[in-house]
Amino acid sequence: MTVGVLVDKLPAGRPVYGVTSLAGELYVLRQKEADQVEVYDVISCRLLRQLTVPNACGYSDMTSCEHHRCLYISDPTIKCVHRLDVGGGTCTQWAVDDVPSGLSVNSANNVLVTCTLVRKIKEFSTDGDALCQVTLPDDVINPLHAIQTVSGGFLVCHGDDCDPLQRVCLVSADGRHTLRCHGGKPGSDTNQYKVARHLAIDANQYVFVADLNNWRVALLSSTLGYIRHVLTSEQFEWGPDRLCLDANRRRLYVAENRWDDGGWIAGRVLVFTI
């Protein structure tokens, strides 16, 4: 893969807490009281409509499920996941019982919810039935986002600003063992991160990593070996915070957010070819 090329920018506005694509449309989640989800055409990047998530109080991530044609939005304020039907606009929610952070959908079309503070990954059906949960190893501090691999293990990015380890790890399916890692002590060298914030994975199990405070996106092999930085700091004005990979169109959507005065104050989505 070559270094990504910027092909479009969506309008800047409120901070972006999630970006996902579904059925030829791109969905962007912003912190607002209404019309929180902006829907764009993936070809023209033209705004098509906006969707409201009723009863939402906060946001930490968004993902989508092609099988169920819906969006999932994690709400850390009321500790729940919102499910939004993109066809009819019907919205339901279910309790997570811990503060939810990153979201992903596995091959069984179930939702994986990463719970940072308790180091757990919880699996739910599309109707919110609790299926199982995995407690991560002690050294996987502050997990932010997790994706299940084809072998059943979990790719997890972890480590906040002040944590001694900031890495991407492959964890066994039962959560007991850390099998492989990339990263370590925080820093800006090739094999370091300053908050490995969010992940995306392609059909060959190659891993894209949003390196928030280094303003770059790393590409790792399926064994978590470093390949290259597909996006570098020169291509960002703010920190890359969320990722969405559209492998069929060879597009990587990156939400970048601006931090100032102790909080996120603005955000937008950049569109790259890869």
Specify the residue positions occupied by each region the protein language model found.
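A short helix->beta-strand "capping" segment at the edge of beta-propeller domains
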Residues: M1-R14, I43-R46
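Beta-propeller fold detector
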Residues: V7-D8, L48-T52, T92-V96, C132-L136, ...
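Conserved beta-strand positions in repeat-built beta-propeller and related beta-rich domains
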Residues: V28-E33, C65, L71-T77, V113-V118, ...
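Structural motif
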Residues: A34-E38, K79-H82, R119-K122, D163-C169, ...
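Blade-loop segments of beta-propeller domains
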Residues: C45-P76, T90-C91
